[in-house]
């Protein structure tokens, strides 16, 4: 049996552990490309131990910025995108990756908060430590998601009781709301979490899974992106039930097709990735047009220095290095 845990609106929930006035109101965390590292101001920074989308590698202790200081640029324009938002904000149509400007237009009373990556990193590590004390095998899938393999450790008829125990322990010790999905295999447990949100638990047995998933749209399954979704719809495959009916087609696509079919059907999807192998490391920043070549060189040197810190912390020895520059009109140089 597998348990998948996903912290609800993690960045918002993390901020609410510090400020209870944020409860039950529309809240969003907004991010923008942080160019503080180019500043001559002395700020203590650390390297993040978590690696995930919308999570900065460079953590600054200078996080107490106002809305004006963080989101409004020198020309008075509101900058940044929504990295996560509360369910109260989602009712107004606010979504992840939406511009802060658009989010405020949809929800004028939206409470915008600059990110505090040090806090998120700390809470994620605390959750991992908690789970490692309660579960034999865990995989950290992202900064706010974990898989737990409890096969042979928790009986199936006791799995719901154990999930409630974990949920209460996480709330009591970390003050974080969490959604939990339970299934016989890894990726089906992740799918179940979508039906546990917000702040719930969803368990479907292997016997009932085909019926439960037959009408679920293919785009709801982890690993089916936009391009693959369009490809599958070209074969008139629109639901997970359609995937189950087309074994020969998926097996003809070799490994990628076989893996997807098996994940959807709950076949041989029972291995956790305890430690992920890093294939690349990088750091980058976006900023307004700079006409001074010396300033551009200075910024490249600063980024290179931070990259060297990350490489040292990860204890790796890269075989190659590259610099990628994207210009104002989409022209690239490497």
Regions found by a protein language model. Give the residues of each.
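DNA-contacting surface of Y-family translesion DNA polymerases
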Residues: 228-334
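Short Gly/Ser/Thr- and Asp/Glu-enriched loop/turn motifs at secondary-structure junctions
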Residues: 141-145, 183-186, 316-320
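Residues that scaffold, gate, or flank divalent-cation-dependent active/transport sites
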Residues: 1-143, 147, 257
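Generic non-transmembrane alpha-helical segments
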Residues: 126, 130-134, 165-174, 231, ...
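Short, structural beta-strand-to-alpha-helix junction motif
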Residues: 99, 217, 239-240
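Catalytic palm subdomain of template-directed nucleic-acid polymerases
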Residues: 148-167, 236
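Long, highly charged, low-complexity intrinsically disordered interaction regions
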Residues: 158-217
């Amino acid at each position: 049996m597998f348990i998948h845990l996903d912290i609800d609106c993690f960045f918002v929930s993390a901020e609410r552990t510090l400020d209870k006035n944020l409860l039950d109101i529309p809240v969003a965390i907004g991010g923008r490309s942080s160019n503080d590292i180019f500043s001559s101001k002395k700020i203590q920074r650390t390297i993040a131990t978590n690696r995930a989308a919308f999570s900065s590698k460079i953590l600054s202790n200078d996080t107490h910025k106002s809305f004006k200081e963080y989101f409004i640029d020198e020309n008075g324009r509101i900058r940044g995108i929504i990295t996560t938002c509360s369910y109260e904000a989602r009712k107004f149509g606010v979504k992840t990756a939406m511009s802060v400007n658009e989010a405020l237009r949809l929800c004028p009373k939206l409470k915008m908060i600059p990110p505090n990556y040090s806090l998120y990193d700390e809470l994620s590590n605390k959750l991992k430590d908690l789970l490692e004390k309660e579960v034999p095998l865990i995989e950290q899938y992202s900064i706010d998601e974990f898989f737990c393999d409890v096969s042979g450790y928790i009986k199936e008829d006791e799995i719901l009781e154990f999930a409630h125990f974990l949920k209460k322990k996480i709330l009591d010790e970390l003050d974080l709301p969490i959604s939990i999905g339970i299934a016989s295999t890894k990726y089906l447990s992740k799918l179940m979490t979508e039906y546990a949100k917000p702040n719930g638990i969803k368990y479907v047995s292997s016997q009932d899974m085909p019926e439960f998933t037959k009408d679920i749209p293919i785009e709801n399954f982890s690993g089916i992106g936009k391009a693959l979704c369009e490809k599958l719809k070209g074969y008139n495959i629109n639901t997970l039930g359609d995937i189950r009916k087309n074994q020969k087609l998926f097996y003809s696509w070799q490994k990628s097709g076989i893996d997807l079919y098996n994940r959807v059907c709950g076949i041989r999807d029972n291995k956790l990735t305890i430690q992920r192998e890093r294939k690349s490391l990088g750091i980058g920043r976006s900023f307004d047009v700079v006409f001074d070549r010396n300033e551009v060189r200075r910024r490249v040197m600063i980024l290179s220095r931070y990259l060297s810190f990350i490489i040292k912390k990860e204890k790796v020895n890269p075989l190659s290095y590259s610099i990628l520059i994207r210009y104002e009109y989409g022209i690239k140089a490497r």
